[in-house]
């Protein structure tokens, strides 16, 4: 009997650790990193800057969701509302840039309908996160945060070149 309890506790702990690791990986993946090997023109630079401008709020929310920082309802509400606004800006910079598109793959423009569907999925996930944040219900928030991160990953996997 104790082995079953230990096994269930171990499974629950492993599930929590996996979830925390996944959230951390998604957050880091969304942050970007060093200089890309792909050339960037001014539109691409603006797009990158707009994506990076979203990260302080997303990272702050992630720390609370993962339990790395105490959950502060008001701080989370504000971060989610700000993130909902700043998350719209990068998508105003997806014109092709003849000076270089950075890590954006040609599929962004050659499969514009699929890219638009990913953008819409992301916008819906962000709105769901903001709505959940305004309720203050942490379990709803965790699910919505995870969905938002998964939406980022889905788009990056299809439309962004890996870092070299």
Regions found by a protein language model. Give the residues of each.
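Bacterial N-terminal signal peptides that target proteins for export
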Residues: 3-21
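Polytopic transmembrane helical bundles with strong interfacial aromatic enrichment
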Residues: 14, 32-36
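Processing junctions and N-termini across compartments
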Residues: 25, 146-149
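Extracytoplasmic c-type cytochrome modules immediately beyond a signal peptide or single-pass transmembrane anchor
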Residues: 37-147, 164
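Short regulatory "switch" loops immediately downstream of catalytic or recognition motifs
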Residues: 1-2, 96
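The canonical Cys-X-X-Cys-His
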Residues: 148-160
